[in-house]
Amino acid sequence: MIMSSYLMDSNYIDPKFPPCEEYSQNSYIPEHSPEYYGRTRESGFQHHHQELYPPPPPRPSYPERQYSCTSLQGPGNSRAHGPAQAGHHHPEKSQPLCEPAPLSGTSASPSPAPPACSQPAPDHPSSAASKQPIVYPWMKKIHVSTVNPNYNGGEPKRSRTAYTRQQVLELEKEFHYNRYLTRRRRIEIAHSLCLSERQIKIWFQNRRMKWKKDHRLPNTKVRSAPPAGAAPSTLSAATPGTSEDHSQSATPPEQQRAEDITRL
């Protein structure tokens, strides 16, 4: 509203100022060459720039070094950065992995690429041997014959086990004391003689059958029937009174009559 009232008021008079040329003619403003203004502006600009941003201190010139694979440290050591840590010594000695790269004389020339460090993979024979399972002699199946891949029939026939003299001697000693083995004792003998439990079990079964045959003992699995010739003898021995009656009846009747007369 105030601005509109000023614009609508017709009595407002615009101030009139003389042009700049009159100021220069009346020597209000001294005349200077354009070089003067340029020099002052540049000097003032530099002066303010120096006050706001002081110049950085001069950097010391150090010889440039190119680090190669020799600067690599072990897992327990830390890398050395800058000249401050150059004099620090670690107790562990770092072993260089490859040859250091040559230092370049000029900084403008491109630095050569560091050589590739070819570190061979360490071999651990102990770890490889530990992964392989240990197979004991008693775990090997020596009593099973080799299987033919072209054989399409049933289970291959087992070959006969050939016991050594030492094995047979130990088995005979055990059979002399115990004809029947427990499971625990069978496992102990199998481990000591490098045989399987099945082999020990079968050997003792065969040895018991042989012992019964040598001592002429009847087989407990089959019942023995009485022989046919022994039946009449047993019957005659069981009934002795019947034979006496039969002999008395065989006497003649005349003798019986004579005995009756004498009794009268």
Swiss-Prot record:
It holds the Pfam family Homeodomain. Keywords: Developmental protein, DNA-binding, Homeobox, Nucleus, Transcription, Transcription regulation. One of its GO terms (cellular component) is nucleoplasm. SUPFAM superfamilies: Homeodomain-like. Residues 233-254 have a biased composition (Polar residues). It is found in: Nucleus. A motif (Antp-type hexapeptide) lies at residues 135-140. Residues 156-215 bind DNA. Belongs to the Antp homeobox family. Deformed subfamily. Sequence-specific transcription factor which is part of a developmental regulatory system that provides cells with specific positional identities on the anterior-posterior axis. This is Homeobox protein Hox-C4. It comes from Mus musculus (Mouse).
